[in-house]
């Protein structure tokens, strides 16, 4: 293609990358050059994308990736071999179904709803601290680094029983996980070294994670980690501390990184006045749905690979072919949405792939939705006159490779 799907230009809020429209014009299955070299294929059609995401011939197994690819630097997640059965994003088939059975009870909507007050308290505390600091400095609060990522990180740690209680601890935990390559695609070296050089000190984080695991074994409190422990015991017969730590480490990153990216965009839309002051709960839910369609935090799915030679959309793919689904492109397809490139929270319905589809559908969707609605409620009740400190059109966002999209900053007057 003439356009690079993996380019990372700086964009404005009202400008979307042209590559997605170009993909649709090129066809339902488009061959591109992968970042690490060699061919890859992007699925651009909504129906075909859902077919691929549900097709057992397309798998997440990183062993099928081209030999030249280098782990997380190329958008892969390659777990420690003995721990692979405990990571949702790198196994398929019955191994994946077993992990879903272990994780699903922890994300039960009723169980999550019971924690709404605690989630609201975390949002309120963070926003109040930012407002107080803004009042002292006379400068607007910066909600990307100061809130959007810290909020979901502190929430998932609270739910798991990991005693990360303040933003400073959260930042340290994230830096260690990224340095170890446990932060998801394109997050770090993946070899136990910091991308800037050196070996990070993991002892403090390991202590916190083990504290959550040991508490779960004692059944001190009804945390997500306790649920994972009970279900893993039932499925595997026994589960080690290392295995539990690996599971909750994956949830910490999955539970905050993409959510943090999305919350930045959602906050921008709320603070730009797109949500009516008298919006009820249903209106807030519709607003969140439209933001999920319009601002997917990941423009493409994680890589999948053809487990065998397969023909899809009239295109024959060889065994091992790397495949992406164009989430943002399908979300803004004019065949499914009126005015697809406009933000309209009153749309009668949504068709989106923001959380994926098929067996690997995001297990944390309900938590992300709850965090989004709760955050809006806290912001509107505590700071009813909050507003952007810069014009909406001056906000900038960019992509980190093919896997995440995020605002660079979000200066706000919290009043």
From Swiss-Prot:
Q: Which terms in the GO cellular component ontology are assigned? A: cytoplasm
In this chain, heme is annotated as bound at: 362
- Name the needed cofactors: heme
Q: Name one GO biological process term.
A: daunorubicin biosynthetic process
Oxidoreductase among the record's keywords? yes
What keywords would UniProt list here? Antibiotic biosynthesis, Cytoplasm, Heme, Iron, Metal-binding, Monooxygenase, NADP, Oxidoreductase
Q: What is its main location?
A: cytoplasm
Subunit composition and interactions = Monomer.
Alphabetical list of PANTHER family matching this protein: CYTOCHROME P450 YJIB-RELATED (PTHR46696:SF1), P450, PUTATIVE (EUROFUNG)-RELATED (PTHR46696)
Misc: S.peucetius ATCC 29050 produces significant quantities of doxorubicin only when it grows in a highly-buffered doxorubicin production medium. S.peucetius subsp. caesius ATCC 27952, a mutant strain derived from S.peucetius ATCC 29050, is the only organism reported to produce doxorubicin in vivo.
The protein here is known as Cytochrome P-450 monooxygenase DoxA
Whose protein is this, by species? Answer: Streptomyces peucetius
